Regions:
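N-terminal glycine-rich phosphate-binding loop for ADP-containing cofactors
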Residues: 1-123
Length: 123
């Protein structure tokens, strides 16, 4: 059915049954938590693509900015990892993986970078 009703008057509205099937949790995450989960999941996917040789570091950054609208102020999905710092990024992803599952699993190449204090972009 989807999340919206499309009545004949043309004004879509949220489907009334949505709240019944997906009630709000009593405790909601903070804005910072939601932001981190969104940024980290996108950066992890870009890092996986780099690790698998699908895309270069520069192309991953440009693609994330122009392709899906990663916040330009953060420099791109890969640059964001450099900005946060690989060690901190990996530690926070490990915590997210514990709480939310495998989608936050860190690729081995990024874990190795974190252990040797490397960056994707040379300064």
């Amino acid at each position: 059915k989807g999340f919206y009703d499309y009545p004949t008057d043309g004004k879509k509205r949220l489907w009334p049954g949505l709240a019944e099937h997906y009630p709000l949790a009593k405790e909601q995450p903070t804005l910072e938590t939601v932001r981190n989960r969104l940024m980290y999941s996108q950066s992890l996917e870009a890092a996986r693509c780099v690790a698998e040789g699908i895309v270069s570091v520069k192309d991953a950054d440009v693609g994330s900015l122009l392709g899906w609208g990663f916040p330009a102020v953060l420099g791109g999905a890969i640059s964001y990892i450099d900005m946060v710092g690989a060690a901190r990024f990996v530690a926070e992803c490990d915590a997210l993986a514990q709480a939310h599952g495998e989608r936050f699993a860190v690729p081995d190449a990024l874990r190795k970078m974190a252990s040797t204090d490397q960056r994707y972009h040379a300064i």
